[in-house]
Amino acid sequence: MEKAQIRISVRGLVEFILRSGDIDNRHVQSPENAMLEGGRIHRMIQNSMGSYYHAEVSLRYQMETERYALSIEGRADGIEDRFFGMSSMEVPPGEISGEKRSAKNGSGRKKTKATSLSERLDTWTVAKTTTQMTTQSFIEQPVLVDEIKGTYRDLKKIKEPMLLHEAQAKCYAYIYALQNGLDNIRIRVTYCNLDTEEKKLFEKDFFFEELEDWFLEVLAQYRKWADYTCEWNEKRTESIRQLAFPYPYREGQKELVTYVYQTIYHQRKLFIEAPTGVGKTLSTVFPSVKAVGEHKADKIFYLTAKTITRTVAEETFALLRGRGLLFKTVTLTAKEKICFCEEVECNPEACPYARGHFDRINDAMYDFITHEDSFDRERVEHYARKHQVCPFEMCLDMSLFADAVICDYNYAFDPHVYLRRFFADASGQNYLFLIDEAHNLVDRGREMYSA
């Protein structure tokens, strides 16, 4: 039997496993503007580099277990390597035991290594320009992996890279070193002010063994989440296989179920118009769930314009769970409605749930997903209070482990608030959208995109 595939991006991995500290939105800029400017800054910096600099390099690491294959993938902002492309870009499967894999010289380049750890550069070097060499800690200049970050912060106040930015660069550096048989490699975190275009660069050298120890430790922390995902997906798929339509079909209902399933199977679009009370919600949710069980879709997004229709969707999934379905659903509630505080001030000084949120959230989530299948507002509030975390942020995070997300149109279509964790890049996931009362999208769309 073919192994299950579990995929996560490099950024998703480090942001999930290594996050810590407080929620603090006091210094956050408008995300849509920052994203547009960030893309421009990336291209500007990448285009200014020399011929040995290669932008947007796709990298992939795969670890095989007895039950599933775990893939960590992403694109390095830049790699500076004069031997680029001379060795295979495919990572050999690793063993789940975590045994170190010896790097093999794949390009004929000279392999060199400092004689002791005291010879390496133990602190960050702040490079003045993109072409300046840092203090030599190895016999020859190593390959460099560049992580570019746009920011509105005063660069003079940045004394060292943020942990998560450094971690992304280290992941890409490890995968690239493993693929290309490198004993050492350099990472660089490049900060560029989005207003002034001023740059500040931090560089650091690593032995391959150092990166491997660090990377395998990160994977070890993610292991329980991957194990859980695999086990849950197996149980979910088996329950879907045995699931039958809960009632005798009404007139025309079986045909509707068939149309919906065929639409999903052939990856088409279907517009449905039918009177109230004919069972449209059940007739669309049931075949959608079946499609997930047959791997025709990875996740269902049930999009609505009204709270009452979100309740109908929750009741429909609850009905199917009552018939034996194992299927996790999350209902996203607006921050203003679910916040525990009188005023929505998301910073550690104003909100005790924001203070230390990221130190506690992963334990809270694991407690939640291993004890509940419905992540509705009432249950979210219960677990958020139990673990003293922000209920709104917890709700968003639980969507990562939900089989269906019930939410307002905004979370899919509004450029200001859409779920970037799912829709910001081409993740390769196959999402299924059930849009209730789609005629409302016209007016809502005008509101979302109005200047």
Name each region found by the language model:
Residues 1-88, 117, 135-139, 167:
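Metal-dependent nuclease catalytic cores that hydrolyze phosphodiester bonds in DNA/RNA
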Residues 68-212:
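Mg2+/Mn2+-dependent nuclease catalytic core
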Residues 168-171, 214, 287, 312-320, ...:
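Alpha-helical scaffold elements adjacent to nucleotide-binding pockets in ATP/GTP-utilizing enzyme cores
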Residues 232-273:
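Conserved pre-motif I regulatory segment
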Residues 262, 281-296, 316-319:
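Walker A/P-loop NTP-binding motif
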Residues 284, 387-404, 409-451:
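Signature of the SF2 helicase/ATPase Hel1-core->accessory helical subdomain module
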